[in-house]
From Swiss-Prot:
The chain crosses the membrane at residues 521-541, 554-574, 600-620, 628-648, 664-680, 771-789, 1190-1212, 1216-1236, 1277-1296, 1333-1352, 1455-1475. It comes from Saccharomyces cerevisiae (strain ATCC 204508 / S288c). The lineage of its organism: Eukaryota, Fungi, Dikarya, Ascomycota, Saccharomycotina. One of its GO terms (biological process) is xenobiotic detoxification by transmembrane export across the plasma membrane. This is Protein SNQ2. It comes from the Eukaryota.
Length: 1501
């Protein structure tokens, strides 16, 4: 250590000596970036040095350009600069640096110059230490949670009573207990513990994320003396919690994601007064260079379902985004998950740099920390079942436990050793004589710690630090620094950096980027609007200007409003809410700013569709073709569309789940449909619901649009003069009346204003008053949405609570435990993970090797930016039964790509040979191999045991006894240590199994299939601690010893774990092989290869896995001069591998293959009928336990039924009553829209699970996903439609006789449910994603509703479209429902519905009308009168049926037609899924069409 400088003065002197002249002259400066000292021109290194250390500072853009110019050399030096800065801070906070180092890129001087510049220019850098004293946190006791089912609804009163009782007597449990810590500014604290130890909870408490702890948090957390409550109120932006999961907007690129985060934190006062643009670019390039993301700038971030960057790169994006938040205190929760060993080390070094130079404070949990990573930290704390068992300097931890009696095994990393102590079933090396003295349980460890001198010293250090810090000074620095950073219009007390309107601007810009990134949704939206406008416009083509077209004109305008109301349903989305919560935690922007920004960004795209829609519809339908009318209707349609869209978005902002939002939106949709005043006019509304029309924007828009259309219009009476025909035509019009609303005796026309006043109570002077009202609605909804979004608290979560199957023994056992002492005091995210995690004594003696898997010269190429990109480059290898092959390489090297290619899961240009026993793979390959994916995707409502049982039944041969399969499942449960939670529901992330338990389940699902060829595993230890990882690898070793072939990618193996593998395939970026061959005992074989080919000698204390990754230049920023791929191609080992591969092919191809009896080379292991049985059971079970989904469905039907029933209560016998009966049936059908949205939201999860995991393993036939989903939906729809029938039909008070009621029930509750469930699923299964399905569904519904004869009578339809009236299934449902209600129903017109006229002198009304009534419908109310004859147009309900082109006699004909549509939906559902997802035909995709057009243009150019 004599050559290490540790004082601040020496560091400053070193920087001062780094002038541009000495830098250029020094032979040691920028080693590896060689140049002739006599050259006249400056090298890039010289330029950069002058910029940073010369008297005149250059701008960030010039620096960035210069770094780019020298990038090939500079990047190769970043790792060495990280090493230099990865020394420990001393008590004084200075960093250490080797003075003899010949590192070329003097990063310390560069970073120090920035810090010095900030100091010279008076720019403060915030920093604070953290003191944690006796902190405890309580949560709901998750050990006795029971999953709810549909049975809870059937016993609703008892369920409500139990819920109230449970709420009052809610059991709490200790999550963390009496934790203490001290982190001075500039220190890094490593938090160790197994999953479930409370590490995540400790970090959340430290970061102030305490809302989720139902039992509250006690103790004291302070930041340089500032209490946590005050810190969260005034300086929340400085405390950052970075969660374990990577949630991002998938359609944004990496560059856009980072730019946005940096822009939100761009200070007003910047070093050297660089511009905002330059600041953002330089920061982004800095983070991207450190984490190796520059090559991904233009790649989408993606997620589990949207292709983007790799999982490791996505994790690095998360880290860079968190750093962009510019916190002074960071809490990193398992931030190295998914990173390879080299990149994980670089991450730790990067955090070390930030703490050294910026004096930030970091708390980090890492489940698999290598010795190199461990040594970058200052202090370490160890948690065991929520209890703290050590806190202190890292080099004192091992001696502390050695004094206790525990010894660290040779070559075991210190972090691994410390974590292993908290595993009661793990292997522990104990000093002789201490076997009965060492602590074993969490309580014993805690007692030892509390009585230790180390604990007493820690308490003294905390007390001394609290005395030392100047809290007021810290506040002053924070206030001054934040004032310097805040932009001009940011509130003084706000902890956000940029002003609110700047946040809105940035969120709007990001909204445009998101929409552009997801082109398919936008294209589908606009195209559907254009298609619908052509169809509807042609349906109402040249609507007559006479009275016969008045109702149709209203129908055109109503349809336009209804269509964009339905489109508003598609805007309900919850997938981005976790991202919003994360960014809120980072203090990037107000959630309300995103609410406004997303609205503003989507508005232009909505306007494009709406404008195209309206222009086509307006001119085709023949509306009032004046400029005033055109622009007025367009304006009000736009205002109403935006207002209703705001209404639905407001609803989604206040709801917790998608099902809740869909249910409420469904009720609102019915209200919008009914109370627009088109279906039921104001005079006909009942007083208890009439107020609804006044609180919805559509009523005001519809009034103004009708006024614009009918004001000043003279409508001739067409075919409605009464009486007419025969001798009546010779009489004067003085003896006739126009049988139309608003008519006057003796007039052959009706004024538009009179029609509106009498029919709707509308007056023209309200037109522009309504404009103001609509503005109020629009602004009101937006304001409410903004408020709800800003202050909406997330659903309490973060700690995964286990939920047991109802009635399970495990649940009953825990529920009976009264004493709190019996409750495991461990983190809710893993209550039972620490139990039974050690090595299990189960033996696999029944695995028999079935073949050798060989791949030779495998290449994989994909289209990329108009060209091709090779992801795998002539990779060869083999897997022999009884061996384990590790697949390693840095993130993005192609490990997962190779695994997917070998497992037949990639689609692209694949060349090379993949053989089993020397022969090409057959149809049974996928099901005879197991594949454990990185993504842990499962059915949330199944238990662990049920998930395993289903996999075993589907993937093992059918001829095997079921008892044998189930016994093997139980064996796997024991081997994986899952007995304690085998009856627990899988659940969702945050409420169910935790990361480790999900990973074990993913492995178990493949193991129970007992693959007899090969087991692929993609990062099986990702997210697990070292002990769980060891247990998993030991399990794989047992499988290999029993004859299993295993190929496994692995990121961060310890030395002991790495040496468990027999063979290694090492890849570098570009999918190029660097090594394939044996590892050897103590890694001797592979180390010999690398040392012999030019790598430095590996020290005996080093981890061989990290050593070889370092040697080949793996990592985000590392680089080496040697071309290890070229060395491999020229090596003896490569020739031996080629020979071995060819020998295996030659020898094995001559042998006869052995196959298990009954195990034919078929695609599936079981028959279709067998699959159908168990897939249906699984899907039905999932539905039965989905209480939230079922409750949402029930509320939609129940409330919807009551709503319709009491809106049209007692329709009566009047003319309006006839219309109301028809509209009641029409609205009942419209209710299917939100119901289908619910169906699609539910079904998409099962589709994604099948496509991502189950289809890849050939578990069962793809059609069963569709069919079982359909069959499982039906019982609930039949049940809840019965509730709807009772609550809607009988309040109408039409006919109560059983025959009519039964027929109505048959049509609506059975036939209609069978129809629309299939329709909703069919549309979903043809769509690329859920939002697109919602749009297409809206298009189809509006299409069918338009042609069912309600809004436009068939008599007025153009001849071309009458076939669509016949083709629309809703036509026949409306005919039957209305026919049942109106058949033989007598009509008695109300006084205002009668048409009055005078007969000729000397005639009574009856005598005068007798000839007319013999041919026409209706009746005279006063036949003996001689004046003011009162005529009613209908006499019986069947007259009205005839008017709408329907007859009661069509009832059973239509019933047969229903079956045709039902079967068509089912067949079409299967066919479209096969076309678009099995065959993956993409030629119909709008984006594919656009891309093909672009490619054609490029070729022409």
């Amino acid at each position: 250590m004599s050559n290490i400088k540790s004082t601040q003065d020496s560091s400053h002197n070193a920087v001062a000596r780094s002038s541009s002249a000495s830098f250029a002259a020094s032979e040691e400066s920028f080693t590896g970036i060689t140049h002739d000292k006599d050259e006249q021109s400056d090298t890039p290194a010289d330029k950069l040095t002058k910029m940073l250390t010369g008297p005149a500072r250059d701008t960030a853009s010039q620096i960035s350009a210069t770094v780019s110019e020298m990038a090939p050399d500079v990047v190769s030096k970043v790792e060495s600069f990280a090493d230099a800065l990865s020394r420990h801070t001393t008590r004084s906070g200075a960093f250490n640096m080797d003075s003899d180092s010949d590192d070329g890129f003097d990063a310390h001087a560069i970073f120090e110059s920035f810090v010095r510049d900030a100091d010279e220019q008076g720019i403060h850098i915030r920093k604070a230490g953290v003191t944690i004293e006796d902190v405890s946190a309580k949560g709901v006791d998750a050990s006795a949670l029971e999953g709810a089912t549909f049975g809870n609804i059937l016993c609703l009163p008892l369920t409500i009573f139990k819920g109230i009782k449970a709420k009052r007597h809610q059991k709490m449990r200790q999550i963390i207990s009496n934790v203490n810590a001290l982190a001075e500014a500039g220190e890094m604290i490593l938090v160790l513990g197994r999953p479930g130890a409370g590490c995540s909870s400790f970090l959340k408490v430290t970061a102030g994320e305490i809302d989720q702890f139902a039992g509250g948090v006690s103790g004291e957390v302070a930041y340089d003396g500032i209490p946590q409550e005050e810190m969260m109120k005034r300086y929340k932006a400085d405390v950052i919690y970075n969660g374990e999961l990577d949630v991002h907007f998938p359609y944004l690129t990496v560059k856009q994601t980072l730019d946005f985060a940096i822009a939100c934190k761009t200070p007003a006062l910047r070093v050297n007064n660089v511009s905002k643009k330059e600041y953002i670019a330089s920061r982004r390039d800095l983070y991207a260079t450190i984490f190796g993301l520059r090559h991904t700038y233009n790649t989408k971030v993606g997620n589990d379902f949207v292709r983007g960057v790799s999982g490791g790169e996505r994790k690095r994006v998360s880290i860079a985004e968190a750093l962009a938040a510019k916190g002074s205190i960071y809490c990193w929760d398992n931030a190295t998950r998914g990173l390879d060993a080299s990149t994980a080390l670089e991450y730790a070094k990067a955090i070390r740099i930030m703490t050294n130079l910026l004096k930030s404070t970091a708390f980090v949990t890492i489940y698999q920390a290598s010795e190199n990573i461990y040594e970058t930290f200052d202090k370490v704390t160890v948690l065991y079942s929520g209890k703290q068992i050590y806190f202190g300097l890292i080099h004192e931890a091992k001696p502390y436990f050695a004094k206790m009696g525990y010894l660290c095994p040779p070559r075991q990393a210190t972090a691994e050793f410390l974590t292993a102590l908290t595993d009661p079933n793990g292997f522990h090396l104990i000093k002789p004589g201490y076997e009965n003295k060492v602590p074993r349980t969490a309580e014993e460890f805690e007692t030892y710690w509390l009585n230790s001198p180390e604990f007493a010293q820690m308490k003294k250090d905390i007390a001394a630090y609290k005395e030392k810090v100047n809290t007021e000074k810290t506040k002053e620095v924070y206030d001054e620094s934040m004032a310097q950073e805040k932009s001009k219009y940011t509130r003084k007390k706000s902890y956000y950096t940029v002003s609110y309107w700047e946040q809105v601007k940035l969120c709007t810009q990001r909204g445009f980027q998101r929409i552009y990134g997801n082109k398919s949704y936008t294209v589908i939206n606009v195209c559907s609007a254009i298609i619908q406008s052509f169809i509807t416009g042609s349906l109402f083509y040249n609507t007559p200007s006479s009275t016969s077209g008045a109702f149709s004109r209203g129908g055109v305008l109503y349809f336009a409003l209804l269509y964009y109301s339905l489109m508003g349903l598609a805007n309900i989305s919850f997938e981005h809410r976790p991202i919003l919560q994360k960014h809120k935690g980072y203090s990037l922007y107000h959630p309300s700013a995103e609410a406004i920004g997303s609205t503003l960004a989507s508005f232009p795209f909505r306007m494009i569709g709406l404008t195209c829609f309206f222009i086509i519809l307006f001119f085709l339908s023949g509306l009032h073709r004046t400029a005033g009318s055109f622009f007025t209707i367009y304006l009000f349609l736009t205002m109403c569309s935006e207002a209703i869209n705001g209404l639905f978005e407001m609803v989604s902002s206040v709801c917790d789940t998608l099902s809740q939002a869909n249910s409420i939106s469904g009720i609102l949709m019915m209200s919008i449909s009914m109370y627009s005043t088109y279906m039921i006019q104001l005079p006909s509304m009942h007083p208890w619901f009439k107020w609804i029309s006044y609180v919805l924007p559509i009523r005001y828009a519809f009034e103004s649009m009708l006024n614009a259309e009918f004001h000043g219009r003279h409508m001739d009476c067409a075919n409605t003069l009464v009486p007419s025909g025969g001798d009546y035509d010779n009489l004067s019009d003085d003896y006739k009346v126009c049988a139309f609303v608003g008519s006057k005796p003796g007039q052959s026309y009706v004024l538009g204003d009179d029609y509106l006043k009498n029919q709707f109570q509308y007056v023209y002077k309200h037109t522009w008053r309504n404009f103001g009202i609509l503005w109020c609605f629009l602004l009101g909804y937006v304001v409410l949405k903004v408020i709800f979004t800003e202050y909406k608290r997330p659903v309490k979560g973060g700690g995964d609570a286990l939920i047991f199957k109802k009635g399970s023994k495990r649940f009953i056992a825990h529920a009976d435990e009264e004493s709190p002492d019996n409750v495991n005091d461990i983190d809710a995210k893993e209550q039972f993970s620490s139990e039974s995690s050690g090595a299990n004594d189960e033996v696999f003696d029944d695995l028999e090797a079935k073949g050798v898997f060989i791949w030779k010269d495998v290449c994989f190429t994909i289209p990329y930016e108009g060209g091709k990109r090779m992801l795998l480059d002539n990779v060869s290898g083999y897997c022999i039964p009884g061996t384990m092959t590790a697949l390693m390489g840095e993130s993005g090297a192609g490990k997962t790509t190779l695994l997917n290619t070998l497992a037949q899961r990639n689609v692209g240009i694949i060349t090379g040979d993949m053989l089993v026993n020397g022969r090409p793979i057959d149809a049974s390959f996928e099901r005879r191999t197991g594949y454990v994916q990185q993504q842990d995707i499962h059915i949330a409502e199944l238990t662990v045991r049920e998930s395993l049982q289903f996999s075993a039944r589907m993937r093992r041969p059918q001829h095997l006894p079921d008892s044998e399969k189930m016994d093997y499942v139980e064996k796997i449960i024991r081997v994986l240590g899952m007995e304690e939670y085998a009856e627990a529901l899988v659940g969702e992330v945050g409420c169910g199994l935790n990361v480790e338990q999900r990973k074990k389940l993913s492995i178990g699902v493949e193991l129970v299939a007992k693959p007899d060829l090969l087991l692929f595993l993609d990062e099986p230890t990702s997210g697990l601690d070292s002990q769980s990882s060891w247990a998993i690898i030991q399990l794989l070793r047992k499988l290999s010893k029993a004859g299993q072939s295993i190929l496994c990618t692995i990121h961060q193996p310890s030395a002991t774990l790495f040496e468990e593998f027999d063979r290694l395939l090492l890849l570098r970026k570009g999918g190029q092989t660097v090594y394939f061959g044996d590892i050897g005992k103590n890694s001797a074989t592979i180390l010999n290869y690398f040392e012999r080919n030019g790598a430095r000698k590996c020290d005996s204390s080093e981890n061989p896995a990290e050593y070889i990754l370092e040697a080949i230049g793996a990592g985000a920023t590392a680089s080496v001069k040697e071309d290890w791929h070229e060395k491999w191609l020229n090596s003896v080992e490569f020739e031996q591998t080629k020979e071995k591969v060819q020998d295996l092919i030659n020898d094995l191809s001559k042998q006869e293959t052995k196959s298990e009896v009954g195990d034919k080379p078929s695609k599936y292991a079981t028959s279709y009928a067998y699959q159908f049985r168990y897939v249906l059971i699984r899907t039905s079970t999932s539905f039965w336990r989905s209480l939230n989904y079922i409750m949402s469905k029930m509320m939609l039907m129940l409330v919807g039924g009551l709503y319709i029933g009491f809106t049209f209560f007692n329709v009566g016998k009047s003319y309006v009553g006839l219309q109301n009966a028809m509209f009641a049936a029409f609205i009942s059908i419209i209710l299917s829209a939100p119901a289908m949205n619910q169906i699609q939201g539910r079904a998409i999860a099962s589709r994604e699970l099948f496509e991502v995991r189950e289809s890849q393993s050939n578990m069962f036939h793809w059609s069963l996903v569709l069919i079982t989903q359909y069959l499982s939906e039906l019982p609930y729809h039949l049940f809840f439609s019965t509730i709807f029938f009772v609550s809607s039909y009988f309040p109408l008070r039409i006919f109560f006789e059983a025959s009519r009621s039964a027929v109505y029930f048959l049509n609506y509750c059975i036939m209609f449910q069978l129809y629309y469930v299939g329709l909703g699923l069919m549309i979903l299964y043809m769509s690329p994603n859920l939002p697109s399905a919602n749009v297409i569904l809206g298009l189809c519904l509006s299409f069918m509703l338009s042609f069912c004869g309600v809004t436009q009578p068939v008599s007025l339809m153009p001849g071309f479209w009458t076939f669509m009236w016949k083709a629309s299934p809703y036509t026949y449902f409306v005919q039957n429902l209305v026919g049942i209600m109106l058949h033989k129903k007598p009509v008695v017109c109300k006084k205002k519905e009668l048409n009055y006229f005078n007969p000729p002198n000397g005639s009574t009304c009856g005598e005068y009308m007798k000839p007319f009534l013999e041919k026409a419908t209706g009746y005279i109310e006063n036949p003996d009168a001689t004046s003011d004859c009162a005529y009613c147009i209908y006499e019986v309900g069947d007259n009205y049926l005839t008017h709408i082109s329907s007859k009661y006699s069509y009832l059973w004909r239509n019933f047969g037609i229903f079956w045709i549509y039902i079967f068509f939906n089912i067949i079409a559902m299967v066919c479209v899924y096969y076309l678009f997802h099995v065959r993956q035909s993409s030629f119909l995709s709008p984006v594919s069409i656009l891309n093909k057009i672009k490619n054609i243009r490029k070729k022409k150019q």
